[in-house]
UniProtKB/Swiss-Prot annotation:
It is a single-pass type II membrane protein. GO terms for biological process: bacterial-type flagellum-dependent cell motility; chemotaxis. MotA and MotB comprise the stator element of the flagellar motor complex. Required for the rotation of the flagellar motor. Might be a linker that fastens the torque-generating machinery to the cell wall. It comes from Helicobacter pylori (strain ATCC 700392 / 26695). Residues 83-97 have a biased composition (Polar residues). GO terms for cellular component: bacterial-type flagellum stator complex. This is Motility protein B.
Length: 257
């Protein structure tokens, strides 16, 4: 009688099941972790973020504003224009502080948790709606801003921000709103440096036609959106000090109330 042969068993037996089970366990853990991340409690995260800010005295950048920085070309023509803009320093001796302050009427100082923002309408600063040439009358006002900056703690950082409205650019050398806003912010920053502000405290950003403060549905609102902002940022230790100095300089009537 013929002997039956046993079926050949896999040499590895059931060993494959162990690593396969481990793989499934890891895959399950991954999906649980992904679900936990997606279902995170935003209020708890914000509370934790606030506590870390207090601990490290860190002033975060507003999340809603994401600038695009455009570096203007460093041309000889630009240097000549900058020189002509600051070619009349002698007149400053005949200007009183009140007269200089009147040149900046229309500017707005806003105090925030991260520092202060001085908003300057572009129709005050520049020759026309699509120009980056600073009005000669405003040079003394920018000089005054530079002197005020020099009174602030050295840890204060100043970011000059350029904004435009959404009017299409026609018959201008600028290819985009970002480029126009960048050149404007850059020029204001250069004048601040000329009047003695430490370059290490300065930077500039361009937001183009993004982040409007009013709907672009009227001439008045477009003038509000077409602006340069000087953002004074600092840590919690110097916050009350810069608020006090800037309020005293730009909003003196507040101190009298």
């Amino acid at each position: 009688m013929a002997k039956k042969n046993k079926p050949t068993e896999c040499p590895a037996g059931e060993k494959w099941a162990v690593p396969y089970a481990d793989f499934l366990s890891l895959l399950l853990a991954l999906f649980i972790a992904l679900y936990a991340i997606s279902a995170v409690n935003k209020s708890k995260v914000e509370a934790l973020k606030t506590e870390f800010i207090k601990i490290f005295n860190y002033a975060p950048k507003p999340e809603a504003m994401q600038p695009v920085v455009v570096i203007p070309p460093d041309s000889g023509k630009e240097e000549e224009q900058m020189a002509s803009e600051s070619s009349k320093p002698a007149s400053q001796n005949t200007e009183t502080k009140a007269t200089i302050a009147r040149k900046g009427e229309g500017s707005v100082l806003e105090q925030i948790d991260q520092g202060s923002i001085l908003k300057l309408p572009s129709n005050l600063l520049f020759e026309n709606a699509t120009s980056d040439a600073i009005n000669q009358d405003m040079m003394l006002y920018i000089e005054r801003i530079a002197k005020i900056i020099q009174k602030l703690p050295k840890r204060v950082h100043i970011n000059v921000r350029g904004f435009t409205d959404d009017t299409p650019l026609v018959k201008t050398r600028f290819k985009s709103h970002y480029e126009l806003a960048a050149n404007r912010a850059y020029r204001v920053m250069k004048v601040l440096i000329q009047y003695g502000v430490n370059p290490n405290q300065l930077s500039f950003s361009s937001y183009g036609s993004t982040n409007p403060i009013a709907p672009n549905d009227s001439l008045e609102n477009r003038m509000k959106n077409n602006r340069v902002e000087i953002f004074f940022s600092t840590d919690a230790n110097d916050l009350s000090k810069i608020h006090s100095i800037l309020d005293n300089e730009f909003n003196p009537h507040k101190q009298q109330e």
